[in-house]
């Protein structure tokens, strides 16, 4: 698969906005898909954020493999990165996020207190790739009491400071992907979970990747969901057999769409597509 290179103008603009507004926030909240704790982190944004304090939120934890979520949280915490694992389809309490923010910024709050300065409100910027669930997370976090804070520095057209409570203000940013995917596996993982448009990658490649990954890591889930599937067969053979078994005749595209939708909707159960072994190839 060739390198996928693309970068819509609005994403380039959003990247600049993130860079310009960093100075107005106390810390950065990075929202990732818990099924892709590593692959759904935008390396371009990570570089821009630099040494700014970070709160890493593993969203959609209800769709991820809980054992893997635990392992990833332990890894990130060992790297000095504070984490939360949440399901933003359920009510996310402001207190949980605010408490995590206060813990993250405890040293700064203490230093300012010694100087006689009381930090009334912490300010953060939420960044993440498309389809990480950022909008749902913010809506749940703010609820119906959401308040737009105007006349503040750092607010570019199309961006708003949102006051969740007296302790926390949030600057929203659009979901931003990076200019090109040089790692084929990362691109396939993003495609399988719906983080990038289906038109960017051939669906047969995405399906074959998904089948092979589930065969290796979650064979019991494949067997449970697709009872006619002979999981010991190679992926292309499985595709041909299942297309016929499901009455699709030779319409392989129909099986690709079905399989990918089943994975995205969690019909195969909880899964995580990143393993700690992936860190070996991470720069």
Segments predicted by a language model, with ranges:
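Structural beta-sheet core signal
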Residues: 30, 56-58, 126
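Conserved active-site beta-strand-loop modules that form the wall/rim of enzyme catalytic pockets
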Residues: 88, 138, 168-171
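Canonical P-loop GTPase G-domain recognition
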Residues: 62-127, 146
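Short, structured loop/turn "capping" segments at alpha-beta junctions
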Residues: 108-112, 139, 145-151, 218-221
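Short, glycine/charged-enriched secondary-structure capping and boundary segments
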Residues: 43-46, 70-73, 99-100, 140-141, ...
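Helix-rich effector regions associated with P-loop NTPase G domains
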Residues: 1-28, 35-36, 41-43, 48-53, ...
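Extended basic (Lys/Arg/His-rich) segments that typically form rRNA-contacting surfaces
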Residues: 54-57, 67
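Glycine-rich phosphate-binding P-loop
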Residues: 123-143, 173
């Amino acid at each position: 698969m060739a390198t996928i290179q693309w970068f819509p103008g609005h994403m380039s603009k959003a990247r600049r906005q993130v860079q310009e507004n960093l100075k107005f926030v106390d810390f950065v909240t990075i929202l990732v898909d818990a099924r892709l704790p590593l692959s759904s982190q935008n390396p371009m944004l990570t570089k821009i954020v630099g040494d700014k304090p970070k709160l890493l939120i593993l969203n959609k934890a209800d769709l991820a493999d809980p054992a893997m979520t635990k392992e990833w949280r332990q890894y990130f915490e060992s790297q000095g990165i504070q984490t939360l694992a949440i399901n933003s389809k359920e009510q996310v309490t402001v207190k949980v996020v605010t408490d995590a923010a206060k813990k993250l910024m405890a040293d700064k709050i203490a230093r300012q207190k010694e100087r006689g300065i009381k930090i009334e409100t912490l300010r953060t910027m939420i960044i993440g790739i498309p389809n990480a669930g950022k909008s749902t997370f913010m809506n749940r976090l703010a609820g119906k009491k959401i308040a737009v804070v105007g006349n503040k520095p750092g607010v570019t057209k199309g961006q708003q400071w949102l006051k969740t409570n007296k302790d926390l203000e949030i600057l929203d940013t659009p979901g931003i992907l990076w200019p090109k995917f040089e790692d084929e596996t990362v691109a396939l993982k993003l495609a399988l979970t719906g983080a990038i448009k289906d038109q960017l990658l051939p669906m047969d490649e995405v399906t074959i990747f998904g089948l092979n990954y589930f065969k290796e890591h979650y064979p019991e889930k494949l067997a449970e969901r697709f009872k006619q599937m002979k999981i010991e067969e190679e992926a292309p053979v499985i595709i041909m057999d299942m297309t016929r078994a499901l009455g699709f005749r030779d319409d392989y595209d129909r099986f690709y769409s079905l399989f990918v939708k089943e994975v995205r909707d969690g019909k195969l159960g909880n899964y995580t597509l990143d393993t700690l072994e992936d860190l070996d190839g991470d720069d």
